[in-house]
């Protein structure tokens, strides 16, 4: 079984990065070539860190076409048209070309909303983001609680 683990956090994110790095360490310790695990990364910095730990990595580059598709997918009408004409998102095409059987998202991410065919699993660490937003990342003006709700709702339906 070929498992893709989406590693989105960066060393500058502190706790999230180290939590994800601990997941890598656990897989390295307990997976003695039982499963074919590949890490999907968006950062060359993270790719270097994971490769130094002996991990197999593939780099997903966010192109302008991917960004346009991401914007179009937010519209129900445009997303329906993309599905009708069987136009897949570049992220899912990338994963299909890698022949992954399942994707593991180690935290809620917008990338999970792009998957239609490939099954996935997602960690959701806490759900009190609406009532107790004491984490600094939730208080920042750029953080959207609605986007987080949408990601979690999508994951509940599809994963």
Give the ranges of each region predicted by the language model:
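Carbohydrate transferase catalytic cores enriched for Leloir-type hexosyltransferases
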Residues: 1-159
């Amino acid at each position: 079984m070929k498992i893709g683990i989406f590693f989105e956090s960066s060393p500058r994110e502190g706790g999230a990065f180290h939590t994800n790095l601990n997941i890598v360490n656990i897989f390295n310790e307990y997976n003695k070539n039982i499963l074919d695990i590949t890490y999907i990364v968006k950062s060359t910095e993270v790719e270097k860190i994971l490769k130094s730990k002996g991990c197999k990595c593939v780099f997903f580059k966010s192109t302008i076409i991917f960004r346009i598709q991401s914007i179009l997918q937010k519209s129900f009408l445009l997303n329906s048209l993309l599905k009708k004409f069987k136009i897949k998102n570049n992220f899912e095409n990338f994963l299909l070309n890698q022949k992954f059987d399942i994707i593991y998202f180690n935290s809620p991410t917008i990338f999970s909303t792009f998957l239609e065919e490939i099954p996935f699993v997602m960690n959701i660490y806490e759900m009190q983001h609406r009532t107790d937003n004491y984490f600094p990342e939730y208080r920042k003006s750029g953080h959207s609680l609605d986007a987080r709700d949408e990601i979690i709702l999508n994951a509940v339906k599809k994963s």
